[in-house]
A protein has these predicted regions:
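Charged DNA-binding/catalytic regions of mobile-element recombinases
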Residues: 1-169
Length: 169
């Protein structure tokens, strides 16, 4: 799904987020000032290697998705499942991810440009997949973590201390 974000110079950046629903894994993201169907198609190709493509892709009916995008999905063997018009609740998992990105990360930072946003989202994606707990996953992270019972608990700041990862040594 796409979401927009203004920069410090009031330039609008578009971010495409791709996630796998099963364990809420944030697979990839892309940032651009001009999202075209070709650019979105390239992002999908990068998100899903040919041997790991999903059976379905749930998306909204944004005008940015065009015939080029649909053709790329068909070539990859992915069935396109657009949601109903103005019905974001039909794609609730990715909408929740976008809300988390905004509330837990981007609302606390000023973005300077595309490269800066990529660095921020890269760090937050690693935190989201490896450390952030999810209630729907019984307080586990999307990438399963082993539970350490012994050792000293240490804190590692993420995104300049906006979040912390706690682990035992």
């Amino acid at each position: 799904d796409l979401f927009v974000l203004p920069t410090i110079t009031f330039r609008i950046l578009y971010c495409l987020v791709v996630m796998r629903h099963g364990r809420r894994i944030w697979l990839s993201f892309g940032v651009t000032a001009n999202p075209t169907a070709e650019w979105i198609s390239r992002q999908i190709t990068e998100a899903f290697p040919w041997d790991q493509a999903p059976q379905y892709l749930i998306r909204d009916r944004d005008a940015s998705y065009g015939p080029v995008f649909v053709q790329r999905l068909r070539a990859m063997g992915i069935r396109d499942r657009p949601i109903a018009f103005r019905s974001p609740w039909q794609n609730a998992y990715v909408e929740r991810l976008i809300g988390s990105i905004r509330r837990e990360c981007l609302d606390h930072m000023i973005v300077f440009g595309e490269a800066h946003l990529r660095r921020i989202l890269g760090a937050y994606a690693a935190y989201y997949n490896q450390s952030r707990t999810h209630r729907s996953l019984n307080k586990d992270a999307p990438f399963h973590r082993a539970i350490e019972r012994l050792g000293t608990v240490t804190s590692h700041p993420i995104l300049g201390g906006l979040h912390h990862q706690y682990c035992r040594i």
